[in-house]
């Protein structure tokens, strides 16, 4: 109830803030200027400089458990899977082929982020957004310690965030121009960005679909320019998840079932660990069929919703369960 109340209050505050901002007007040009290389280079350079200082200070960066899992795939210890987006794993593998050091992956990641910051500043400058607004946004994106910290890890979340930042700037450009900026080259670029957003996180497809729907709803008169971008996004996504993944022998995610019922299974595991007497015989029989109670006690972390996912490969998939068997 407390968390729900906080979430509701935060949502209400956001909605009220958005409503209040309706009266705030920015002077936007009727037509965009030519790309502003000076603004792009200054913003990207500043972001890259800040990131370089952080990387040197915390050299060679950090690895999360997700990244360790991906590196084991790259090293051949385990087969490539799409548990963590395989495209991101393949990108890391390609970079490590060039320079076999994790800091190189982080350096490229920081460069990509700096380019996204520079592109965002360039879009705002081309539409003559006030300089102080561009300065504040660039400073926030470059100096925010939370962003600097997470960018020191080669997480899929970082790659996804970079793609989303590019997408946000592209959508602003489309919005300000009412779709007129969608040249063939920019349609290709927008489609590629939408595809990357859909692939680099398993739930990123929701954002890509929402962005595509917004484009069609907000600019129905420009559907002839929008549809090619959406078609490119679909074809690119299918091409990567299909032929490309097949060429590299990417195993389809075997734990999609686990993703579906991981939360209720975690709740049951917590109860089975802490208060098994409160479960009825049918539930106990099901849990014992998956694994003996000693396994739950050994591996369970009370309140950790990720627990079932992390141990799925070694514990919970010794039997070929289906959704009907689980829920039936």
Language-model segments: residues:
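Extracytoplasmic catalytic/substrate-binding loops of multi-pass membrane glycan-assembly enzymes
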Residues: 58-70, 79-91, 99-104, 319
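Membrane-interface alpha helices of multi-pass inner-membrane proteins
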Residues: 186-201, 212, 232-237
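Transmembrane-helix motifs of polytopic, lipid-linked glycan transferases
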Residues: 107-128, 166
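Transmembrane-helix signature of polytopic, membrane-embedded enzymes
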Residues: 41, 120-143, 162
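Start-transfer (signal-anchor) and selected internal transmembrane alpha helices
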Residues: 1-53
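Aromatic- and kink-enriched transmembrane "portal" helix at the membrane-lumen/periplasm boundary
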Residues: 1, 59, 86-89, 98-102, ...
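Membrane-proximal stem/loop segments at transmembrane-domain junctions that anchor or position
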Residues: 250-328
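Specific aromatic-rich, kink-prone transmembrane helix
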Residues: 75, 119, 159-178, 190, ...
């Amino acid at each position: 109830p407390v968390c729900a109340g906080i979430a509701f209050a935060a949502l209400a505050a956001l909605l009220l803030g958005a409503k209040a901002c309706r009266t705030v007007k920015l002077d936007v040009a009727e037509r965009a200027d030519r790309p502003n290389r000076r603004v792009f280079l200054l913003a990207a350079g500043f972001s890259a400089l800040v990131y370089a200082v952080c990387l040197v200070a915390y050299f060679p960066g950090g690895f999360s458990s997700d990244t360790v899992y991906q590196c084991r795939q790259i090293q051949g210890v385990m087969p490539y899977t799409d548990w963590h987006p395989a495209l991101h794993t393949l990108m890391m593998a390609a970079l490590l082929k060039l320079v076999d050091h994790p800091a190189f992956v982080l350096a490229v990641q920081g460069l990509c982020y700096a380019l996204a910051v520079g592109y965002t500043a360039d879009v705002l400058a081309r539409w003559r957004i006030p300089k102080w607004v561009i300065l504040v946004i660039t400073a926030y994106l470059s100096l925010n310690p939370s962003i600097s910290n997470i960018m020191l890890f080669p997480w899929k979340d970082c790659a996804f965030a970079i793609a989303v930042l590019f997408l946000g700037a592209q959508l602003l450009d489309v919005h300000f121009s009412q779709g007129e900026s969608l040249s063939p080259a920019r349609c290709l670029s927008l489609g590629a960005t939408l595809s990357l957003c859909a692939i680099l996180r398993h739930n990123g497809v929701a954002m890509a679909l929402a962005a595509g729907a917004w484009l069609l709803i907000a600019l129905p008169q420009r559907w002839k320019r929008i549809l090619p971008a959406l078609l490119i996004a679909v074809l690119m996504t299918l091409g990567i998840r299909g032929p490309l993944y097949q060429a590299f022998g990417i195993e389809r995610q075997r734990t999609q079932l686990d993703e579906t019922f991981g939360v209720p299974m975690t709740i049951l595991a917590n109860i089975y660990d802490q208060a098994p007497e409160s479960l009825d015989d049918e539930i106990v029989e099901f849990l014992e069929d998956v694994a003996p109670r000693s396994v739950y006690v050994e591996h369970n972390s009370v309140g950790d919703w990720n627990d079932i996912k992390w141990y799925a490969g070694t514990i919970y998939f010794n039997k070929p369960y289906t959704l009907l068997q689980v829920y039936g």
